[in-house]
A protein has these predicted regions:
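PLP-dependent class I/II
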Residues: 1-128
Length: 128
């Protein structure tokens, strides 16, 4: 079976058409990644490398485990994800889902205002 003519024409347009929207999206993701990295590394107990081409940060959150956070204590990043979602209403994927206990995956594929609000909620929760 072959690729349909419509799909071929659409693919050609996608790679040969105006790519300014792609450049704008890339700039937005770079800006959000830098912002999220800065906000995460300002939280005591969190260390994070700058994202390199991804749409998420993958910080080490081991410094938050075993601590009183919002009156509760998480012993792993899965428990921490539940605690943060329950109390701060911020969602992240625990590192255990990627074979990396003690880490967390925070997506920055969202608007700037929502990103800042979420990181501020997380920081407020951790700082008590």
């Amino acid at each position: 079976s072959n690729v349909s003519n419509v799909a071929q024409i659409a693919a050609l347009e996608a790679v040969s058409g105006d790519l300014s929207a792609v450049a704008m999206m890339r700039e937005s993701f770079e800006r959000r990644g830098t912002l999220m990295h800065k906000m995460l590394t300002a939280i005591p107990g969190v260390t994070c490398m700058e994202p390199q081409g991804a749409f998420y940060c993958f910080p080490n959150v081991r410094g938050l485990l075993g601590r009183d956070i919002g009156g509760k204590t998480a012993t792993n990043s899965m428990e921490l994800a539940d605690l943060v979602l329950d109390v701060a209403k911020v969602a992240f994927v625990p590192g255990e889902a990627f074979g990396a206990p003690g880490y967390a995956r925070f997506s920055f594929a969202l608007g700037d205002d929502d990103l800042v609000e979420g990181m501020e909620r997380l920081a407020t929760l951790v700082r008590g």
